[in-house]
Amino acid sequence: RFFLLALAGIQFTHILDFMIMMPLGPEFIKELNISTHQFGLLLSSYTFAAAIAGIFATYYVDRFERRQLLLSLYACFIVATLACGLAPNYEMLFIARAFAGAFGGILGSLVQTIVADSIPFERRGKALGTVMAAFSVSTVAGVPLGLFLANHIPALGWRAPFVFIALISTLILYLGYRNIPKISGHLDHVHEGSRFNQIFKIVTAPQHLRAFIFMAFIMITGFSVIPYIALYLTTNVGIHVSYISLIYLCGGIATLMSSRFIGHMADKYGKVRVFRVLAIISLVPLLVTTNLPVTPLWIVLINSTTFFVLVSGRMIPAMALVSQVVDNKIRGTFMSLVGSVQMLASGIASVVA
């Protein structure tokens, strides 16, 4: 129980570190005197750095014991996040975000690798649902609390959420140190040939290519919309900025309640079937979100909550499927590449959108 809780905590903080930027968009634009395009670049600095770091990680991720690597990277992530809160200007914040993305991106794929290494496929959907509920918790508690701190600690302003994330991450680092066991089964396998040839074989395997393309399209469809929800609702739909926390809160609570249920359904009825259903249904709130005129708050809440549940829900059966197409001995490398594809796709979507 504490094993999955520690992994979920790591996921929670690095997802929150990424997500907190989105609802703070209007404040960043105002306080740093930047354009919407520059804000998009600030978001993409995290994702592109995560993508590049994930590619570099393929060279070493399967050559270290999982626990030691996870905790070391998490400590570096904490330092980078604190640097975001201490950044004096846009340029330094841009650099700090890139470092946070580099460490955070590897953490995400490494956590999923550890779950896949430790939990049998038959129960993996529910386990991933537990860990990926971190996304929900970050929206339920993290994002509203981050916005509250930013609005009610004038001395820190937008810096407050990053300081908060660094502090809570330090506690989770200790929890992980005490409860995550040593995971070294993958080190028993002999890696033949040069590391480059191994990675090339992983990248070019047909089933792996299909998985990369699959994950890229999932991320593009979500992150062409998600980063700009707060800006779109306040600018085009007429929602007051004070209600943004409520929108994320409702979406997060609903996603938290649905994550384990979706994981259970994926284990019971099949990952492919559940993914197809969620993918088709999610098109409705996706299209509504991008075409909303000035609309009453209650309608916005219904649509945005449905959007969060379905768009994030797709990832649970999707990740369970993707984690199964690769052997245990190269899973860390493969999942790092999957993480890089996810971050690269979301970064491109953020810039193009």
Residues covered by each model-derived region:
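Conserved MFS/SLC helix-loop-helix module at the cytosolic interface between two early adjacent transmembrane helices
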Residues: 52-88
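A late C-terminal transmembrane helix in Major Facilitator Superfamily
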Residues: 329-353
